[in-house]
Amino acid sequence: MDSQIKHAVVVKVMGRTGSRGQVTQVRVKFTDSDRFIMRNVKGPVREGDVLTLLESEREARRLR
């Protein structure tokens, strides 16, 4: 694997997505930089949680 593991803090929970609402879309801020991206998270998540991202370049599409 070429990419490094990155840690990101959940800044805002945007909403639920997926066919049955099993995925939560969140806005995260990387701890090592000032970058913000949107990610889809499976499982319980709330603001302030720290996520370990194996793939840090992939960004989720916006909710409709």
UniProtKB/Swiss-Prot annotation:
GO terms assigned for molecular function: mRNA binding; structural constituent of ribosome
Single GO BP term: translation
Cellular location(s): Cytoplasm
GO CC term (a single one): cytosolic small ribosomal subunit
Any Pfam family: Ribosomal_S28e
Cited InterPro entries: NA-bd_OB-fold (IPR012340), Ribosomal_eS28 (IPR000289), Ribosomal_eS28_CS (IPR028626)
Keyword tags: Cytoplasm, Ribonucleoprotein, Ribosomal protein
Record Gene3D superfamilies: Nucleic acid-binding proteins
Family that this chain belongs to: Belongs to the eukaryotic ribosomal protein eS28 family.
Protein name: Small ribosomal subunit protein eS28x
Organism this protein belongs to: Arabidopsis thaliana (Mouse-ear cress)
Gene for this chain: RPS28C
